[in-house]
């Protein structure tokens, strides 16, 4: 016998699907999604399912909070099927049987009959994956970290290359809009680390209505699929009901994709702006000869655009752009770049802003640096020197350099005055900064960088992009808002 349909009318789902049309290109192998269960935000549920729609799944594992505290154990499941507005969703009785027989923390329950946490997403499962089997898992709001770890170990063997994990979770609850934004930023900080232990710092329901579901999902994806969450939207019930500013609920939509050599660009949705940032960029020195080879140059350009999808790019340009003839006394520590080649490459990569706050802009003196600024501006690029900022629509970008190759002082160049000036610029826009700092070939921040990072955070910076070390960081450090 199946649980009856909780939402019998398909109109709300059809309306949401109409708002989120099918994608023109596949986003890659989607192995997990996190969606709301408030149908006020049904368009966001539809958006995530559209991203997963090209997948061929044999099993869906659905995680959601036990809203009405009906589970007597940390987790509950069922072998019963579900009716929806789009037809039945059948359970994977074999998979459920394995879970119940091997994990005493999981019980069979009737709670699924009335919980909107599962019923809000099942119509989309039936609509997109009508033959896929379901393993539903209700996560008790009183379950603990050790329970979640045990659940991960129980679920992991059931995840194959044809499994989609659907996490049904709403985020900050019962807060005014300003507080909701602060709590969402804290949650985004935790998600950005890609670490399940970061979720443990969040509070329930101030940050989300199921820490357990988020923790289990993050850990499963990391352990089984080597995947981390990508946030594609963060909205609040206020965005749908602008007169209701009290006791809001927020939504953070996430997708997980299996690793790709070159990740497929995700769609840019209404109200969003996607920008990419490139660290040390140069078309001189060691890059000069390879770029003369048309095959190599075309391959490199294709690779870059495959990553960015042609989205606007901000680069830290190392060296001096100049007209020929070049100076005769060139060394590996002085980088010269021809203006024609450099501007052609910047246009091809859709570079919007060029940061010249670094240790190579004075390689050929102040006059050459000034001429470089003129050449780049004449070519149509925004140019930022140390301490300068530019409005790039969705954010304001500030350029800072803590290093120089010339002059008496070559380190510790970012002053307290620079930081105070940042605070004066605090506007409605988020402030991002491109910082030239650190030591070459050292990916970890030293005490100087950590000290600056603390100050930048205190002065309201939302994102700090570092350059100079020639190696990428292994992880993202939370910044912006408060860390929980």
Each model region followed by its residue ranges:
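Active-site histidine-anchored catalytic micro-motif
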Residues: 2-242
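A structure-centric signal for secondary-structure junctions around beta-strands
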Residues: 29, 57, 248, 272, ...
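Hydrophobic side chains in beta-strands
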Residues: 35, 255-256, 400
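Short, glycine-/Ser/Thr-/acidic-enriched flexible segments
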Residues: 40, 172, 259-261, 438
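Conserved hydrophobic/aromatic beta-strand scaffold that supports enzyme active sites
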Residues: 124, 136, 251-253, 314, ...
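Short, surface-exposed amphipathic charged segments that create phosphate/polyanion-binding patches used
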Residues: 150-153, 244-251, 397-402
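Long, Lys/Arg- and hydrophobic-enriched amphipathic alpha-helices
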Residues: 234-263
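Acidic, metal/ion-coordinating pockets
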Residues: 261-484
């Amino acid at each position: 016998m199946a649980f009856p349909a909780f939402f019998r009318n398909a109109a709300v789902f059809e309306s949401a699907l109409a708002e989120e049309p099918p994608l023109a290109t596949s986003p890659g192998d989607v192995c997990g999604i996190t969606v709301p269960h408030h149908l006020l935000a049904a368009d966001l549920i539809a958006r995530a399912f559209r991203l997963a729609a090209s997948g061929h799944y044999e099993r869906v594992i659905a995680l959601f909070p036990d809203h009405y505290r009906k589970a007597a154990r940390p987790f509950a499941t069922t072998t019963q099927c579900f009716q929806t507005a789009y037809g039945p969703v059948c359970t994977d009785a074999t998979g459920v049987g394995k879970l119940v027989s091997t994990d005493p923390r999981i019980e069979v329950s009737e709670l699924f009959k009335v919980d909107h946490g599962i019923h809000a997403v099942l119509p989309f499962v039936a609509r997109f994956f009508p033959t896929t089997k379901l393993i539903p898992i209700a996560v008790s709001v009183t379950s603990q970290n050790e329970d979640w770890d045990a659940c991960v170990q129980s679920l992991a063997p059931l995840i194959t290359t044809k499994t989609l994990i659907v996490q049904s979770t709403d985020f900050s609850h019962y807060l005014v809009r300003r507080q909701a934004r602060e709590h969402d930023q804290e949650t985004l900080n935790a998600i950005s680390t890609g670490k399940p232990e970061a979720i443990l710092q969040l509070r329930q329901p101030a940050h989300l209505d199921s820490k357990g579901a988020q923790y289990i999902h993050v850990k499963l994806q990391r352990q089984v699929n080597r995947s981390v969450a990508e946030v594609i939207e963060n909205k609040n019930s206020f965005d749908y009901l602008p007169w209701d500013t009290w006791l809001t609920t927020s939504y953070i939509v996430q997708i997980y994709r299996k690793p790709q050599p070159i990740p497929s660009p995700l769609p840019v949705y209404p109200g969003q702006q996607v920008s990419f940032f490139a660290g040390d960029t140069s078309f001189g020195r060691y890059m000069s000869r390879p770029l003369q080879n048309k095959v190599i140059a075309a391959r490199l350009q294709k690779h870059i655009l495959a990553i960015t999808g042609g989205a606007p790019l901000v680069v830290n340009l190392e060296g001096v752009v100049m007209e020929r003839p070049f100076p005769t006394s060139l060394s590996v520590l002085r980088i010269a770049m021809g203006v024609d080649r450099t501007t052609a490459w910047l246009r091809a990569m859709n570079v919007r802003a060029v940061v010249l706050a670094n240790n190579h802009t004075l390689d050929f003196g102040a006059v050459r640096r000034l001429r470089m600024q003129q050449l780049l501006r004449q070519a149509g690029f925004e140019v930022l020197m140390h301490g300068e900022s530019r409005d790039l629509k969705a954010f304001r970008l500030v350029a800072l350099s803590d290093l120089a190759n010339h002059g008496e002082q070559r380190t510790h160049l970012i002053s307290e005055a620079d930081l105070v000036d940042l605070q004066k610029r605090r506007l409605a826009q988020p402030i991002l900064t491109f910082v030239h700092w650190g030591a070459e070939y050292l990916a970890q921040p030293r005490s100087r960088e950590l000290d600056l990072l603390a100050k930048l955070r205190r002065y309201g910076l939302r994102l700090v992009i570092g350059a100079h070390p020639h190696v990428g960081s292994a992880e993202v450090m939370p910044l912006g808002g408060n860390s929980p």
